[in-house]
A protein has these predicted regions:
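N-terminal membrane-proximal hinge/A-helix region immediately C-terminal to the signal-anchor transmembrane segment
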Residues: 1-94, 98, 113, 117-125, ...
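Cytochrome P450 heme-thiolate monooxygenase catalytic core
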Residues: 1-9, 72-83, 91, 95, ...
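Cytochrome P450 proximal C-terminal region
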Residues: 6, 33-34, 123, 166-171, ...
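Cytochrome P450 I-helix active-site segment
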Residues: 6-16, 116-120, 168-172, 187, ...
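Proline-centered turn/helix-capping motifs that create local helix->coil transitions or kinks
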Residues: 158-159, 204-216, 270, 310-315, ...
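Cytochrome P450 catalytic-core helices
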Residues: 253-278, 389-404
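Conserved cytochrome P450 K-helix/beta-meander segment immediately N-terminal to the heme-binding cysteine loop
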Residues: 339-366
């Protein structure tokens, strides 16, 4: 083990480092990797310990998988707990394991297959309400679609009545995650948005609890789950925390990924032509099904490449619970290790011309030639996103269903900028013009 510290900016004024990170966090972390290499040491504001930024796939594996028991989560816990309570995203240790075991069956392949029909039906419903020549913010459209899918599949509930309220409240809440210290006015806005979100979620919980109905979905499981020690049921607050976590993770990440897919396809018409040809040949005008996914390989590669370029879960932090070693350097107990899928997935060593959109990076041969942890848009290890397979199928089916009738073009002059919050959003949305496809087969 190297007894020395890794290179970095630890001697720079901590306030200057904090300012640089807040101003443009993606450029900040990309700059650390570019200027100092695979492991960087820095200080941040008045944080009492060193922080380390690691970007090499081997170190990513060590932090997320091989040495994950030596770390706890690190983030603005207080703010996230205000929104998600003690749900799966925030909890640690045995509580986290129990919550994960409780939810896991609803993300097994067999269960996910049963959601395919609802995913396709909702995508078709969206495409039928679109109008030729209309301008839409594709981020809002994909947000609605992903929200309806999570509500229908995991919660057995039509959330359309609350969709706009939930979307706007979540946007306000996520905006506040960009700041670590909120002025009072912002905190008041945050509290109001959280209140609106709670009202919608509690309404869904109370309506289902009143019926006592077991629909075999995730919400029923949460309401009927019994404590291993005393046999008691979850309180509305406990159900709310779990439901809020899964609802946020289940729709926010998918909505962002789908939005970036449409943007990338519009920028690369040569890929779009091949994409439309694949969809037309595989589906011949009918609704996409689960068993169509093997016949839509390019569609899957497009989704994977969008997740590489714009990973929704773009950064994670871990706090060392003991003295350990990562990348050949000592990490003291209490230190924080930060990993960014965005940075690693834009590393030219693993992805030549990393800014270029190239779905062919996802052929079996290309994947086998790269380190496993050069790509981790859903994190990895014991805290990997449970919904990875759910999101993958949702992405393929929704892209295919919408592309059967439409092609989309970015409105000229519309600004495209990243907004790195808890997830990676488009700061100004993505305004796109809908164009009905004249070359598609008749759609059933």
């Amino acid at each position: 083990m190297n007894s020395k510290h890794p290179p970095g900016t630890a001697d720079a004024p901590p306030g200057a480092t904090l300012y640089a990170m807040r101003r443009d966090p993606i450029s900040f972390f990309m700059g650390l990797a570019r200027d100092y290499g695979d492991m960087v040491r820095f200080r941040l504001g008045d944080h009492p310990h060193d922080l380390f930024f690691v970007s090499h796939p081997d170190s990513v594996r060590d932090v997320l998988v091989t040495q994950d028991r030596s770390f706890s989560k690190w983030f603005s816990v207080e703010r996230i707990r205000e929104v998600l309570g003690d749900g799966l995203f925030v909890s640690e240790g045995e509580i986290h394991l129990r919550q994960r075991r409780l939810a896991q069956p609803f993300f097994h392949r067999e269960r996910i297959a049963s959601y395919a029909e609802q995913m396709s039906a909702l995508a078709i419903r969206l495409r039928e309400r679109w109008q030729d020549g209309a301008v839409v913010d594709i981020c809002r459209e994909m947000n609605w679609l992903a929200m309806m899918i999570v509500g229908s599949t995991l919660f057995g509930t039509n959330v359309e009545i609350d969709a706009a309220e939930i979307r706007d409240a979540l946007s306000e809440i996520l905006d506040q995650f960009e700041r670590s210290i909120l002025p009072q006015a912002d905190r008041e806005d945050f509290a109001k948005a959280l209140g609106r979100l709670d009202t919608a979620v509690y309404r869904i919980i109370q309506e289902r609890r009143a019926t006592g109905e077991d629909r075999g979905d995730l919400l029923s499981m949460l309401l009927l789950a019994q404590d291993e020690d005393d046999g008691g049921r979850m309180s509305d607050l406990q159900v709310r925390d779990e439901a809020m976590t899964i609802f946020l993770a289940g729709h926010e990440t998918s909505a962002n990924a789908l939005s970036w897919c449409w943007y990338l396809l519009a920028q690369h018409p040569e890929v779009e032509v091949r994409f439309h040809a694949e969809v037309d040949e595989a589906l011949k005008g009918r609704a996409p099904r689960m068993d169509d996914t093997p016949r839509l390989p390019l569609t899957g590669r497009i989704f994977a490449e969008a997740l590489r370029l714009y990973p929704p879960l773009w950064v994670v932090g871990r706090r060392a619970l003991e003295d350990i070693e990562i990348g050949g350097y000592p990490i003291a107990k209490g230190s924080v290790v930060i990993i960014s899928s965005y940075v690693t997935q834009h590393d030219a060593r693993w992805f030549p011309e990393p800014e270029r959109f190239d779905p062919e990076r996802w052929t079996a041969e290309a994947r086998a030639a790269r380190p496993k942890f050069s790509y981790f848009p859903f994190s990895a290890g014991s805290r990997a996103c449970l919904g990875e397979a759910f999101a993958g199928m949702e992405g393929v089916l929704c892209l295919a269903a919408l592309a059967q009738k439409w092609r989309l073009r970015v409105v000229p002059g519309h600004p495209i900028a990243l907004q790195p919050q808890l997830t990676l959003r488009a700061r100004h949305g993505i305004k796109m013009t809908l164009a009905a496809r004249a070359d598609s087969p008749p759609v059933a």
